[in-house]
């Protein structure tokens, strides 16, 4: 037999993708921090709970965190953006708080982390434009492309928390476990 070996230099984006795929394939739970324990944050946490994610809900309001079902970790923090700094590498950050200014602080902190695997925020086109201006003012305009806004995409126009949660769960599964058919690293065989 004959073995062919090919070596290529990988850029940081490809390497991050390989690391995410390796983590998903190994069965390790992917850390997901949901910022906001309101209706949408709760629905997202419930949708992600049975999936291969380790969900932690972070909020400034301990009374809302107390209403979460067992099995979902929670953290009451007066400055939720501090949870971003303490999160493990390759974590996903979902920002769905009740306060736009707080959303901006949390998302900016998450985007400042080069090892953040996913950063998403709930919002409209107007919120997206405001956040892009905010990033430009902070000197982080290059990070805007990494932000998923609105989380879950905009293919379904339904604002019910459970629908948003289903779309977010699907988006995270594709992001972390999907395959890119154009990427030769994912083509192991050609099937008839």
Positions of predicted regions on the chain:
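Segments forming oxygen-rich coordination pockets for charged ligands
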Residues: 1-60, 66-70, 85, 171-192
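Structural motif
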Residues: 31, 91-93, 118
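Residue-level detector of alpha-helix initiation sites
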Residues: 38-39, 101, 126
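Short amphipathic alpha-helical segments
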Residues: 45-47, 69-70, 105-108, 132-134
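ADP-ribose/adenylate-binding Rossmann-like module
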Residues: 58, 97, 108-134
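Active-site regions of enzymes building and remodeling cell-envelope glycoconjugates
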Residues: 69-78
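Short amphipathic alpha-helix with an adjacent loop that forms part of the alpha/beta core around
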Residues: 80-89
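Adenosine-phosphate binding glycine-rich loop
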Residues: 122-192
């Amino acid at each position: 037999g004959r073995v062919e070996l090919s070596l290529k230099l990988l850029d940081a984006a490809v390497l991050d993708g390989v690391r995410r795929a390796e983590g998903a394939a190994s069965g390790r739970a992917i850390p997901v921090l949901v910022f906001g324990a309101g209706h949408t944050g709760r629905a997202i946490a419930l949708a992600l709970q049975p999936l291969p994610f380790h969900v932690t809900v972070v909020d400034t309001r301990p009374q809302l965190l107390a209403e979460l079902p067992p099995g979902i970790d929670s953290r009451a923090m007066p400055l939720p953006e501090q949870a971003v700094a303490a999160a493990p590498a390759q974590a996903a950050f979902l920002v769905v708080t009740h306060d736009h200014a707080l959303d901006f602080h949390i998302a900016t902190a998450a985007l400042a982390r080069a090892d953040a695997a996913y950063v998403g925020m709930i919002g409209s086109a107007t919120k997206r434009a405001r956040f892009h201006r905010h990033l430009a003012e902070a000197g982080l305009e290059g990070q805007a492309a990494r932000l998923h806004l609105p989380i879950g995409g905009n293919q379904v126009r339904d604002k019910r928390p459970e629908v948003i949660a289903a779309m977010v769960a699907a988006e995270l599964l594709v992001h972390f476990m999907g395959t890119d058919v154009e990427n030769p690293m994912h083509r192991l065989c050609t099937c008839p």
